[in-house]
């Protein structure tokens, strides 16, 4: 009650819903979207995750996910605006203490106009509504965690220079940051280079219970969450 930004809904008993199976759960997957720009390891882990879910009783449904291109592009300036507000007391007054990546994001946010911001908000709300409608036909949506295995430090060094790197990292996370959808990320295997690979289940707003149930059921019959990459 002291936090006016919170939602006054009761917290469910998540443990009570851990049935160990997924009977009666409809899981949607857009195979075109989840395969475009996704490497073989990430695609294989998603497919295997869906196979396990089906074995646990889930119904796998083919869906068409709303085109996320605009909201992915909007995520960067919107993030910049939010970060600029958070750092207003120290940026740009202490700009020389900031690294180039964060400074660049702050500059991007500060460069947006009120008109720019409102257009982003409208596009975000339209996309959020389209995803909400999709959840009238399925209980969960399955997507990769990112388009490739966990990147090495050497690969991450090119973060500001290789556009495909940031795109691959954010392709399957930005859309659900923009909709505010809850997700659970589950380890599902390893790439040939030893990097861990994961996939996600995405749920309806305030239906974290379904995500906890799905994650628990998956991890009861797999042991990827107990394995570690060779270091």
Please describe what each predicted stretch is.
Residues 32, 65, 138, 144-147:
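Short, well-ordered beta-to-alpha junction loops that form the rim of enzyme active sites
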Residues 52, 174-177, 193:
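Hydrophobic/aromatic ligand-binding patch that stacks against planar heteroaromatic rings
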Residues 195-204, 211-212:
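Short, well-ordered beta-strand elements
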Residues 5-9, 73, 89, 119, ...:
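Short, surface-exposed loop/helix-turn segments at secondary-structure junctions
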Residues 40-64, 87-93, 117, 121-138, ...:
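Acyltransferase
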Residues 130-133, 163-187:
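Small-aliphatic-rich amphipathic alpha-helix that forms the alpha element of a beta-alpha
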Residues 1-44, 48-49, 67, 221-231:
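A short helix-breaking turn/cap at a secondary-structure junction
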Residues 16-31, 78-132, 144, 182-196:
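Short helix-loop capping/hinge segments that flank enzyme active sites or metal/cofactor-binding pockets
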């Amino acid at each position: 009650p002291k936090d006016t930004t919170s939602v006054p809904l009761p917290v469910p008993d998540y443990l009570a819903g851990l049935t160990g199976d997924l009977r009666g759960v409809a899981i949607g997957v857009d195979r075109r979207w989840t395969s475009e720009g996704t490497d073989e390891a990430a695609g294989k882990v998603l497919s295997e995750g869906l196979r396990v879910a089906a074995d646990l009783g889930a119904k796998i449904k083919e869906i068409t996910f709303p085109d996320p291109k605009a909201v992915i592009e909007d995520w960067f300036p919107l993030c910049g605006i939010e970060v600029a507000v958070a750092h207003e007391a120290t940026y740009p007054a202490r700009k020389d203490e900031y690294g180039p990546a964060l400074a660049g994001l702050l500059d991007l946010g500060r460069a947006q106009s009120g008109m720019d911001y409102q257009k982003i908000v409208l596009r975000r709300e339209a996309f959020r509504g389209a995803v909400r409608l999709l959840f009238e036909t399925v209980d969960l949506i399955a997507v990769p965690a990112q388009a490739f295995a966990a990147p090495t430090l050497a690969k991450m060094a090119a973060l500001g220079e290789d556009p495909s790197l940031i795109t691959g990292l954010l392709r399957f996370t930005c859309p659900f940051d923009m909709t505010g959808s809850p997700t659970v990320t589950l380890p599902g295997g390893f790439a040939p280079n030893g990097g861990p690979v994961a996939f996600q289940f995405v749920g309806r707003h305030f239906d974290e219970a379904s995500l906890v149930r799905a994650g628990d059921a998956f991890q009861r019959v797999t042991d990827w969450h107990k394995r570690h990459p060779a270091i």
